[in-house]
Each structure stands twice: as C-alpha cells, then as structure tokens.
C-alpha cells in the first residue's frame, strides 16, 4: 500500500530481462505514466498518462522499451501488477521522475512528493543511454 504523494519511477528492466507490465489500481487513485525510451522511435521521450482508480477499473499496459512510474493521488492506493518476466535487480534501471523536460503532469505539487532515495538518483532523459532500440517491423521485439 502506498500513501498520498508517493511517486515511483520511472522504472524499467534492461534486456535480456526487459518486462512488459499490465497494471491496475484496486484501491484509491493514481496517475500512471509510461515514457517511450526506445532509441530511434518517433515517439521517443513522449509519455502517456492514465488515471487509474478503484471506481473506473481501467488497466494500463506498459510494453518493453517504456519506463513506468506513478503518483498516488488518494489517501492511499493499492496496485496489482502482471509482468511477463521476473524481477532481476541487476537489470533495474530508471529515468528521473522529476525530469521537467518530459512534461508530465503528476497531479500534485512537487513539495508534496514522497520519493525513495533510489528514485532520486535516476538520470534525466537527456543524460540517459537507452538499451532499447525501436524496430518498426510488426511483431518485432524492441530491444538490442
């Protein structure tokens, strides 16, 4: 369970342990975000943000090659994740959730944000060398 103001991300796993995720909020309300980090992608650095609540029952799919993050907008929130690969700490990576160049509206003031020490150390997108490469062929995996 996470409380109001908790922000996590923007996380991904490097190949060969890359993950796709299907997420939903089973209690509370969150803004959930995916950022395209595939080199060469026409949407590189762009994001999609979705409001997930226990009332709207929406799910959000984050494919491999996208960084994932969220902010809790209710008193508390509980997530449910489905992943297509196991967690591998040695493959853990991230982009700064505070990178203003991404233009993400997190729905709360940064003074209210509660970040883990780990999440304050991720590089900004401009300083990041992505391990993912965009492949425009249908059905192709988007990684090196």
Residue ranges and their predicted role:
Residues 69:
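Short alpha-helical functional segments enriched in proximate histidine and acidic residues
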Residues 1-58, 74-76, 83, 88-140, ...:
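Non-catalytic, conserved peripheral segments adjacent to functional cores
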């Amino acid at each position: 369970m996470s409380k109001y103001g908790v922000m996590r991300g923007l996380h991904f796993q490097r190949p060969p342990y890359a993950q796709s995720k299907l997420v939903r909020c089973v209690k509370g309300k969150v803004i959930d975000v995916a950022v395209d980090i595939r080199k060469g992608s026409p949407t590189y650095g762009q994001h999609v943000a979705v409001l997930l609540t226990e009332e709207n029952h929406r799910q959000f799919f984050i494919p491999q090659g996208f960084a994932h993050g969220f902010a809790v907008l209710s008193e508390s929130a509980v997530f449910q994740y489905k992943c297509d690969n196991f967690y591998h700490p040695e493959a853990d990576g991230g982009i700064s959730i505070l990178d203003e160049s991404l233009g993400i509206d997190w729905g709360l003031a940064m003074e209210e944000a509660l970040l883990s020490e780990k999440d304050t150390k991720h590089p900004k997108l401009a300083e990041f060398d992505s391990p993912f490469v965009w492949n425009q062929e249908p059905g192709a995996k988007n990684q090196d």
